[in-house]
Structure formats: structure tokens, C-alpha cells
């Protein structure tokens, strides 16, 4: 685990504690840019195992490449809670350590300048990934950066 994980744990606990006072169901959104660990170094299961599931609706991996979601599917399924995804279409999924520098030098402020846009993720290709993940148990299905209305329309075919 990275040194920042202690601070990260505190922030996660504070976030989860803060929503308890509302006594409402909640969904956890997490981002894994590459591999199987969160940016702070933890596995998803380490976070989920620390919380009370009473009001938890599920977990969603957001802004994740289809391939990286596939890499994390086994662990997320093992949590025995509803799960899903919001797939992205970037070429680079982990722009660190120079993300901030690249963003600041950007002429347009558009992350596509330094993350790139995948041309292979047509609506049909994204539907193939979404079908695979739905068949594996995903119940929350969506798109994130570089998905288009055509991708979402393709996802709507999953019933």
C-alpha cells in the first residue's frame, strides 16, 4: 500500500459516515485506472469489507476501460453486492505521473489531447463488452468519457 493510503482510508470512512446521517441508500463509485488497485493502493474488497452494507445499493467502477473492468471482474463479483460499470474510450488509462503537467500545458483543456480516443470501441464492440459483463452479473451499465449516444443506444439492447 502507498503512504497515502492512511489518508485515503480516513477520507473514505468520513465519506461513508457522512452519508449515514441521511439514512438513504447509496452507491459507491470507484476508479481504477489500471491494474486491480485503486489509485491509493487498496483493492476494492478492502474498502467494501470495512463498511456496513445495510443501505449499500452496490458498487460501480467508473471511467474504466473495458479491458481493465474485465481484469477486475472476478474480485468485484466476489463481493456479493450489486455491481456495474461506466466504460470509457481513452487510449491511455493511466496518464500518471504527468497528467497535471500535460493538462496544464494543454491548448484546449481537453483530456483527449493527451489521453487519446480509441477508434476501435464502436457501439457494437462496446456492446460485446457490456453483454459479457452483464452475463457475468453486472446490473448497473453505462458509459463514461468518449462514449456517445450511439454507445448508450447499443447498451439499451441488453435486456
Language model features by range: what are they?
Residues 1-7, 11:
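Single conserved hydrophobic/aromatic residue that forms the stacking wall/gate
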Residues 9, 33, 90, 147-148:
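Conserved beta-strand edge residues that scaffold enzyme active sites
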Residues 9-20:
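Active-site loop-helix segments enriched in His/Asp/Glu that coordinate
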Residues 10, 61-63, 144-145:
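Short, thiol/selenol-centered motifs that function as redox-active sites or metal-ligating centers
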Residues 24-33:
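Acidic, His- and aromatic-enriched active-site or binding-groove loops in soluble protein domains
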Residues 33-47, 51-140, 158:
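Catalytic-face loop-and-helix region of soluble metabolic enzyme cores
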Residues 140, 145-150:
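A short, acidic, flexible beta-alpha connecting loop/helix-capping segment that sits on the rim
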Residues 148-159:
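C-terminal helical cap(s) of enzyme catalytic domains, especially alpha/beta-barrels
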Amino acid at each position: 500500500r502507498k503512504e497515502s493510503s492512511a489518508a485515503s482510508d480516513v477520507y473514505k470512512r468520513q465519506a461513508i459516515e457522512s452519508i449515514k446521517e441521511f439514512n438513504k441508500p447509496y452507491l459507491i463509485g470507484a476508479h481504477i485506472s489500471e491494474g486491480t488497485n485503486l489509485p491509493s493502493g487498496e483493492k476494492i474488497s478492502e474498502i467494501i469489507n470495512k463498511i456496513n452494507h445495510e443501505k449499500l445499493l452496490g458498487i460501480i467502477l467508473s471511467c474504466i476501460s473495458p479491458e481493465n473492468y474485465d481484469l477486475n471482474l472476478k474480485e468485484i463479483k466476489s463481493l456479493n453486492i450489486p455491481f456495474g460499470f461506466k466504460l470509457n474510450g481513452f487510449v491511455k488509462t493511466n496518464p500518471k505521473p504527468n497528467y497535471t503537467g500535460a493538462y496544464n500545458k494543454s491548448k484546449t483543456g481537453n483530456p483527449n489531447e493527451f489521453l487519446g480516443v480509441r477508434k476501435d470501441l464502436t457501439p457494437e464492440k462496446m456492446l460485446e463488452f457490456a453483454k459479457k459483463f452483464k452475463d457475468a452479473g453486472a446490473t448497473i451499465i453505462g458509459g463514461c468519457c468518449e462514449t456517445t449516444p450511439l454507445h448508450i443506444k447499443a447498451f439499451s439492447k441488453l435486456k
